[in-house]
């Protein structure tokens, strides 16, 4: 189809020869019919995906109607709507193709985004060996990843204390309204076993007996209660055990336990008797924590007025009291084969005492410069501390090193405990939640030498495997590792090829 068969080339003055009007109209009609025939044949050849190329081809054909192969131009040619009709036909063909694909998907039963009609995601079509798709591998890894710690427990009431059962996978949660919730925990789910109503006021501390059959609780109502865990029946009630609100409990063995109140009074009790064995008041402020070693000869107590007080259990009298500190002594733990006592303070410091010499500390570590209110020994040389900043940090004892962040809360941490196997750490915060952290990886930590170089700034902010946060440096470390692998691979290939011929 060429227009130059009917038109003469223009002269230098761009004048067209006189042509019969009927001939021009006939030629234009033939051109329009040819274009329509071509568009109909192209509908079967092109799909919606090729619409762009098709329109471009048709536009070129339309331009041929006005411009001849030898460059001639007909200004008298009439405009037609053939182009519009072609576009409409192409769009209609594309819509029909899309409709057919939609009907086919419906017949296969596939939902949006790879889901079945019920809306449940189906990832069976993903190919884990498809190394070219990083997203596919990440999705499969997330699906197959198993939990290493139980899910979070959330309560409506403020959680004042938590305690693990000495033998079973049970954790007790004491609340501000005086109830104790018993949960059976597991990596997949946590199950509420029972709720025991024990006190009329806030239950400040909860402990299990050594055999795990009974719960001991103390409260702001000045009472101590011993409750059977299975039957929920009250076994023993120490009514008005103290003149002031009781703040802390500590179980020494199967027979003895100690209590401390807000006024600094410490009492020792025997489960077989009604009254306390003895009581001493050596400080004027709240007892924050109590503990003893395996020999149970000395009972140690820290207080909010900055004293570390030691009581001789056998002699039932004061053993020694430390020099006063200008900060609250809030927690403590025993390390290095029962040879070291470490106490945490409200200023974030850690004081170390040689066992038996509690008058003054032998070493001091500045710590994290944030109030430390809780401490739990993880191993003989590693402690976990927590406080008002909402972070649980691990530190190495003697020499002191910040190992990193074990876990995080959005609000200050209220209580901290570790289970009987030493693999699971639990913490509660002011947000009424309990979170679990798997700390089994600490078994592989080696001893730290005194002269070993370290970066204190990075260690304080480093996230350990149990943390829900990742380190920014890990992303670049992976990139560096991949680059090193590529470099090593290239070096091996060069080595195998023999010496270079370049001189």
UniProtKB/Swiss-Prot annotation:
<feature type="repeat" description="WD 5">
    <location>
        <begin position="324"/>
        <end position="363"/>
    </location>
</feature>
<dbReference type="InterPro" id="IPR015943">
    <property type="entry name" value="WD40/YVTN_repeat-like_dom_sf"/>
</dbReference>
<dbReference type="InterPro" id="IPR036322">
    <property type="entry name" value="WD40_repeat_dom_sf"/>
</dbReference>
<feature type="repeat" description="WD 3">
    <location>
        <begin position="241"/>
        <end position="279"/>
    </location>
</feature>
<keyword id="KW-0853">WD repeat</keyword>
<feature type="region of interest" description="Disordered">
    <location>
        <begin position="476"/>
        <end position="503"/>
    </location>
</feature>
<feature type="compositionally biased region" description="Acidic residues">
    <location>
        <begin position="31"/>
        <end position="48"/>
    </location>
</feature>
<feature type="compositionally biased region" description="Low complexity">
    <location>
        <begin position="107"/>
        <end position="122"/>
    </location>
</feature>
<keyword id="KW-0677">Repeat</keyword>
<dbReference type="InterPro" id="IPR019775">
    <property type="entry name" value="WD40_repeat_CS"/>
</dbReference>
<feature type="repeat" description="WD 1">
    <location>
        <begin position="154"/>
        <end position="193"/>
    </location>
</feature>
<dbReference type="InterPro" id="IPR001680">
    <property type="entry name" value="WD40_rpt"/>
</dbReference>
<comment type="similarity">
    <text>Belongs to the WD repeat WDR55 family.</text>
</comment>
<feature type="compositionally biased region" description="Acidic residues">
    <location>
        <begin position="12"/>
        <end position="23"/>
    </location>
</feature>
<feature type="repeat" description="WD 6">
    <location>
        <begin position="408"/>
        <end position="447"/>
    </location>
</feature>
<feature type="repeat" description="WD 2">
    <location>
        <begin position="198"/>
        <end position="237"/>
    </location>
</feature>
<feature type="repeat" description="WD 4">
    <location>
        <begin position="282"/>
        <end position="321"/>
    </location>
</feature>
<protein>
    <recommendedName>
        <fullName>WD repeat-containing protein 55 homolog</fullName>
    </recommendedName>
</protein>
<feature type="compositionally biased region" description="Acidic residues">
    <location>
        <begin position="76"/>
        <end position="87"/>
    </location>
</feature>
<feature type="compositionally biased region" description="Low complexity">
    <location>
        <begin position="61"/>
        <end position="74"/>
    </location>
</feature>
<dbReference type="InterPro" id="IPR050505">
    <property type="entry name" value="WDR55_POC1"/>
</dbReference>
<dbReference type="Pfam" id="PF24796">
    <property type="entry name" value="WDR55"/>
</dbReference>
<feature type="region of interest" description="Disordered">
    <location>
        <begin position="1"/>
        <end position="131"/>
    </location>
</feature>
């Amino acid at each position: 189809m060429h227009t130059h068969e009917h038109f003469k080339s223009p002269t230098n003055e761009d004048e067209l020869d006189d042509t019969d009007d009927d001939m021009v109209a006939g030629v234009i009609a033939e051109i329009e019919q040819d274009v329509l025939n071509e568009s109909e044949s192209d509908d079967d050849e092109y799909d919606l995906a090729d619409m762009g190329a098709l329109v471009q081809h048709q536009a070129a054909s339309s331009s041929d109607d006005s411009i001849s192969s030898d460059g001639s131009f007909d200004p008298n040619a009439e405009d037609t709507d053939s182009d519009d009709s072609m576009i409409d036909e192409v769009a209609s063909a594309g819509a029909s193709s899309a409709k057919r694909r939609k009907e086919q998907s419906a017949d296969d039963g596939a939902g949006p985004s790879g889901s079945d009609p019920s809306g449940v995601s189906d990832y069976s079509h993903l190919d884990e060996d498809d190394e070219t798709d990083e997203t596919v591998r990440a999705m499969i890894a997330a699906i197959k990843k198993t939990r290493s710690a139980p899910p979070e427990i959330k309560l409506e009431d403020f959680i004042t204390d938590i305690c693990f059962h000495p033998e079973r996978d049970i954790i007790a949660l004491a609340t501000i309204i005086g109830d104790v919730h018993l949960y059976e925990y597991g990596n997949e789910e946590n199950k509420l076993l029972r709720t025991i109503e024990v006190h009329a006021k806030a239950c400040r501390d909860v402990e299990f007996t050594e055999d795990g059959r009974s719960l001991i609780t103390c409260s702001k109502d000045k009472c101590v209660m011993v409750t059977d865990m299975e039957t929920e029946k009250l076994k023993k009630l120490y009514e008005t055990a103290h003149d002031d609100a009781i703040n802390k409990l500590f179980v020494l063995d199967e027979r003895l336990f100690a209590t401390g109140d807000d006024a600094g009074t410490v009492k020792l009790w025997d489960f077989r008797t009604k009254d306390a064995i003895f009581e001493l008041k050596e400080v004027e402020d709240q007892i924050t924590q109590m503990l003893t070693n395996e020999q149970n000869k000395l009972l140690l107590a820290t207080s909010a007025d900055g004293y570390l007080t030691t009581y001789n259990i056998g002699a039932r009298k004061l053993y020694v009291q430390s020099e006063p500190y200008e900060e609250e002594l809030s927690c403590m733990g025993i390390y290095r084969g029962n040879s070291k006592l470490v106490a945490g303070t409200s200023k974030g410091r850690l004081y170390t005492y040689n066992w038996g010499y509690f008058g003054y500390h032998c070493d001091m570590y500045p710590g994290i410069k944030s109030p430390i209110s809780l401490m739990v020994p993880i191993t003989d040389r590693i402690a976990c501390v927590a406080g008002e900043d909402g972070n649980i940090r691990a530190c190495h004892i003697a020499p002191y090193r910040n190992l990193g962040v074990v876990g995080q809360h959005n609000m200050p941490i209220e209580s901290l405990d570790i289970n009987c196997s030493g693999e699971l750490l639990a913490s509660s915060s002011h947000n009424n939640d309990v979170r679990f952290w798997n700390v089994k990886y600490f078994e592989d930590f080696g001893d730290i030498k005194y002269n070993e170089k370290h970066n204190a700034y990075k260690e304080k902010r480093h996230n350990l495997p149990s943390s829900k946060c990742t380190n920014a440096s890990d992303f670049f470390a992976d990139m560096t590792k991949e680059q090193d692998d590529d470099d090593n691979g290239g070096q091996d290939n060069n080595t195998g090829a023999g010496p270079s011929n370049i001189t």
